Amino acid sequence: MMPDFTDKEVLDLGCGYGWHCAYGVQKGAAKVLGVDLSEKMLCQAEKINSHEKISYQRAAMEDLEFPADSFDIILSSLALHYVQDFPSLVLKIRRWLRPEGTFLFSVEHPVFTAYGSQDWYYDEKGEILHFPVDNYYYEGKREAVFLGEKVTKYHRTLTTYVNTLLKNGFILESLVEPAPPENMMDLPGMKDEMRRPMMLLVRAKK
């Protein structure tokens, strides 16, 4: 799924602690720019994933502006479902990418974001019954709890994710709904992760 990073200039949208920035450099990237809105995360990224080829910038990805053809690879890990205007950002991303450039991203799966609560339904004994999927075709704002705090996310259908790329001239190269690997099935709760997808991975080319 990952592209060849050798001598590439990379933009990481929603870079968090900079793990993917470091990965890009490890794989031979010439330069990596990590962008995130969280000052705390960027401070930590500077501590644990600092490198002469990595720079960090604090900004909302929707507010970013770069010249056309600035990057060979643009990636985003579990951040785009926090963006309200996905089509406008995709249009920018295509402009920022060089010809044949790669756009690679992961988001929470639309099945996972549809209902909003992002939690299982349990019986009176606390046993899992099922995972709720409701209001799937009603796109827009959802309130969820993440690490004990209420956060706002934006639900989109799978069709919207794919067609937004296609309408903006991207070529879809790969789409993956990752399942837990077999060697993790003995871990507590892991078998339940086979009951619904949690993430969606997409790779497209300009």
PLM-predicted stretches and their roles:
Residues 87-102:
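A short glycine-rich, Lys/Arg-flanked "PGG" loop and its adjoining helix->strand segment in the class I
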Residues 72-87:
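A short SAM/SAH-binding and catalytic strip from SAM-dependent methyltransferases
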Residues 107, 111-120, 145-160:
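Acceptor-substrate binding/catalytic loop of class I
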Residues 152-175:
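Short alpha-helix
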Residues 9-64:
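Class I SAM-dependent methyltransferase SAM/SAH-binding core
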Residues 168-170, 188-206:
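Core SAM-dependent methyltransferase catalytic element
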Residues 62-73:
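A short acidic, Gly/Pro-enriched loop at the edge of an enzyme's catalytic core
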Residues 102-140:
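Conserved class I S-adenosyl-L-methionine
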